[in-house]
Amino acid sequence: LDTDLEKICGDIDSAREAGADIVVCYLHWGSEYQREPDENQIYMAQTLADRGADIIFASHPHVLQKTDILTSEDGRNVPVFYSMGNFISNQRTETLPSIANKRYTEQGMIAVVDLSVMKSTGEIIEKTMRVIPTWVDRYGSPTKYAIVPLDADMNSNAALNASGHLSRAQEALQDVTALLGEDCLKGINMPGISADAEKSEKKAA
């Protein structure tokens, strides 16, 4: 773990030295089918945020995990997507009979982060993070797969109409909303630096 973490931190340093305005990390970590990040994921995320990462995306557990906003040592707000689930996969209720969390393997997300940058300084002044939840549908012969956005148009989705799986998609949306919260689906705005860091800067000035 420490060897991998040291290498990633070195990559962050190299990116900054090369003039990168924004550093994005994408991690392959965590335990399969676990819906909560483990202590290693949490430790690594905070370490990378402190080292200079601006956004952290991740996958591998094959199920969704929570999102978070970390505060780095220098006061930046750093969005973390601990696991983005399965975007497209054959892992599902029908194919994983022995896995307790099998239905959650059908769920995924499109993670969206919008950045507002001060052109004169390159400083990130605002970030918005949100999630578009998705569900993998499988139906037909020959087998067809469809990525279904779990949104207001779900009831009229062509794939769900063909498969008859609307109720499963609706259940998936309930699962995702309970895990991530409605605010994350709508969008969370945050300043580039945390409110506490901003107060400290003003006091120092």
Where on the chain are the PLM-derived regions?
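Acidic, metal/ion-coordinating pockets
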Residues: 1-205
